[in-house]
């Protein structure tokens, strides 16, 4: 780890861990305290929304009712996003005159944004109108994040309550998460990004004259559109000179802010946060990285406060941070060094592997952003992940395959890590012959079934989907690179979709009916099967009586528990993928060696 990256990592984590406790305390009170002074400004609006929608905020739900509400809400969101894409050619705020999105791409995109994945198989600036970007995609960036946070609060209430049949009210949780947490933070971040040069307008695309003309050769075509040949049978060409460029415009900052805070990741432009209109400066890059992890880190403190012991949240956060630092080190070391092939040629490796990276960020900031965005289930990128070295790409891929629990998504990261915590405690209890318990709740057979479903759904989707994609002609047709790297592209795509990340190895041609359907189904089931299992677990825990702490109870706040949790995540989460990783990035790395 070089000194520049080490300094950047320490500075970044210091700011993150200083801010997280304050935000965590605010989130708890904003979500649970109806008399919190800091949210008094929006209470009238909250009550109005309940009245207009016919919601009784005092009526709580069982876990089944909560799950049904989540699914209905998400299905309605899917329908709305799909319809807006298909009808955008007839709707306003479409200065470029973009037509309807194809049915398979609209299907994939609607699931992608509703599931908090934001996988983009299309180029946004040439596919989506301003209205679709604002009313469909940006709105779902808020709502999908609110769903994840709501499910987490239902699970935390399961730990905090005892002898109770309910886990909260989804409509209240989603409303408060959006109104009091996501909207204020997004407004503040959007203004900060605008100050750094991120654009925010609804102007038509601009055609500008470039400083230097570009020329290229193009085949001459006859009246039928076929290439013209000379007497020797060679194609005739003509030289074209271009000195203009079309610059895409749009309301970028407002979508950029919530894409990061909501850990959605879908860019307003195809280059995502590598685009200077989305991420123009070093300061904007730092703000974007902080925005990605601030809510997941803060929710660890929220969890500790709600269960009555802040040390519980700190222990979870410590495990996340240690895993994060380890994989950041792996990625940075791989990117700072040249690839094995270039090293063999004695190329100058002073700058590291700069392929696919923006010179304004360099290797250190690009590698850290890659780890941040895949530690969270964000998917925003400031470098092209397909250009990472074999070992450099292994780090981000592994972070997703761990189940997006190293910080993870808004709410989803912590409830995924809590599932691993229950599994670790259960295994430890079996090893010492004691009934496993966590936070005073006895862990029984039903609980472990739900934990197993939550943990194993995504590996099944990733491995089965990858096997299908590399076994059928439609899947193989999308692989633009042969061998191990082509396999890595498919494995990365399924890992990203099933774990609701959204980033990609862009060498895979995924905007096809086959991949749009396959990845869409992986995103849907990877999101909502896990949510239903977590809510069932929450209902089971809420109904249990709290056991008194005894000398034989396993402490869940110290170094032993942190090591146990990290070991469980690595053994259960990572070992599942060892054969697939051996065929992909590991094989690619070994093949590149002279």
Curated annotation (Swiss-Prot):
Query: Chief localization class?
Result: membrane
As for subcellular location, the record says:
Cell inner membrane
An annotated GO cellular component of this protein is: plasma membrane
- Topology versus the membrane, per the UniProt entry? Multi-pass membrane protein
Query: InterPro entries attached here?
Result: KdpA (IPR004623)
Q: Say yes or no: keyword Cell membrane present.
A: yes
Q: Which residues cross the membrane?
A: 4-24, 65-85, 136-156, 179-199, 287-307, 314-334, 361-381, 390-410, 413-433, 450-470, 518-538, 560-580
Keyword annotations for this protein, in alphabetical order, are: Cell inner membrane, Cell membrane, Ion transport, Membrane, Potassium, Potassium transport, Transmembrane, Transmembrane helix, Transport
Q: Which top-rank group of organisms is this from?
A: Bacteria
State if Cell membrane is listed as a keyword: yes
Q: Which GO terms describe its molecular function?
A: P-type potassium transmembrane transporter activity; potassium ion binding
Known role: Part of the high-affinity ATP-driven potassium transport (or Kdp) system, which catalyzes the hydrolysis of ATP coupled with the electrogenic transport of potassium into the cytoplasm. This subunit binds the periplasmic potassium ions and delivers the ions to the membrane domain of KdpB through an intramembrane tunnel.
Q: What family, per the record? A: Belongs to the KdpA family.
Q: How does it assemble?
A: The system is composed of three essential subunits: KdpA, KdpB and KdpC.
- This one is known as Potassium-transporting ATPase potassium-binding subunit
What organism does this protein naturally occur in? Bordetella avium (strain 197N)
């Amino acid at each position: 780890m070089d000194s520049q990256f080490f300094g950047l990592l320490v500075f970044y984590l210091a700011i993150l861990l200083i801010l997280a406790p304050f935000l965590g305390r605010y989130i708890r009170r904003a979500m649970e305290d109806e008399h919190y002074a800091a949210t008094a400004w929006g209470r009238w609006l909250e009550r109005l929304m309940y009245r207009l929608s016919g919601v009784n905020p005092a009526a709580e739900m069982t876990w089944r009712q909560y799950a049904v509400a989540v699914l209905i809400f998400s299905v309605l969101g899917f329908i709305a996003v799909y319809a807006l894409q298909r009808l955008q050619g007839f709707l306003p705020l479409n200065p470029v005159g973009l037509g309807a999105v194809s049915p398979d791409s609209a299907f994939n995109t609607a699931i992608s944004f509703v599931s908090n994945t934001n996988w983009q198989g299309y180029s946004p600036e040439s596919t989506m109108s301003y209205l679709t970007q604002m009313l469909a995609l940006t709105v779902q960036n808020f709502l999908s994040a609110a769903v994840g946070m709501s499910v987490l609060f239902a699970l935390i209430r399961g730990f905090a309550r005892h002898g109770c049949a309910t886990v909260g009210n989804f409509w209240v949780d989603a409303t408060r998460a959006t109104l009091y947490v996501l909207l204020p933070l997004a407004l503040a971040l959007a203004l900060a990004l605008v100050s750094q040069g991120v654009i925010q307008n609804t102007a038509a695309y601009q055609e500008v004259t470039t400083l230097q003309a570009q020329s290229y050769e193009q085949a001459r075509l006859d009246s039928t559109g076929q290439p013209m040949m000379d007497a020797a049978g060679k194609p005739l060409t003509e030289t074209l000179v271009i000195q203009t460029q079309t610059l895409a415009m749009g309301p970028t900052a407002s979508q950029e802010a919530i894409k990061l805070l909501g850990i959605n990741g879908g860019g307003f432009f195809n280059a995502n946060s590598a685009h200077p209109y989305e991420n123009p400066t070093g300061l904007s890059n730092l703000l974007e990285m902080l925005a990605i992890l601030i809510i997941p880190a803060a929710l660890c403190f929220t969890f500790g406060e709600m269960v009555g012991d802040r040390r519980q949240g700190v222990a979870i956060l410590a495990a996340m941070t240690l895993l994060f630092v380890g994989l950041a080190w792996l990625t940075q070391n791989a990117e700072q060094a040249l690839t094995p092939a270039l090293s063999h040629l004695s190329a100058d490796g002073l700058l590291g592997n700069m392929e696919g990276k923006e010179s304004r960020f360099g290797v250190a900031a690009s590698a850290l952003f890659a780890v941040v965005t895949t530690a969270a289930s964000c998917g925003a990128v400031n470098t092209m992940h397909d250009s990472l070295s074999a070992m450099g790409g292994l780090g981000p891929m592994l972070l997703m395959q761990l189940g997006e629990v190293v910080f993870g998504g808004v709410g989803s990261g912590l409830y995924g890590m809590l599932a691993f915590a229950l599994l670790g405690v259960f295994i430890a209890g079996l090893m010492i012959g004691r009934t496993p318990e966590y936070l005073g709740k006895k862990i029984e057979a039903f609980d472990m079934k739900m934990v197993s479903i939550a943990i194993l759904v995504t590996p099944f989707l990733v491995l089965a989907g990858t096997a299908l994609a590399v076994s059928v002609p439609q899947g193989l047709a999308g692989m633009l690179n042969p061998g191990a790297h082509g396999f890595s592209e498919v494995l990365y795509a399924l890992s990203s979709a099933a774990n609701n990340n959204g980033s990609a190895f862009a060498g895979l041609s995924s905007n096809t009916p086959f991949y749009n359907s396959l990845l869409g189904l992986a995103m849907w089931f990877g999101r909502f099967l896990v949510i239903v299992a977590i809510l069932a677990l929450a209902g089971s825990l809420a109904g249990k009586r709290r056991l008194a702490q005894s000398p034989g109870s396993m402490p869940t706040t110290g170094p032993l528990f942190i090591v146990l949790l990290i070991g469980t995540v690595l053994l259960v989460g990572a070992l599942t993928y060892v054969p697939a990783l051996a065929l992909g990035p590991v094989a690619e790395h070994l093949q590149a060696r002279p």
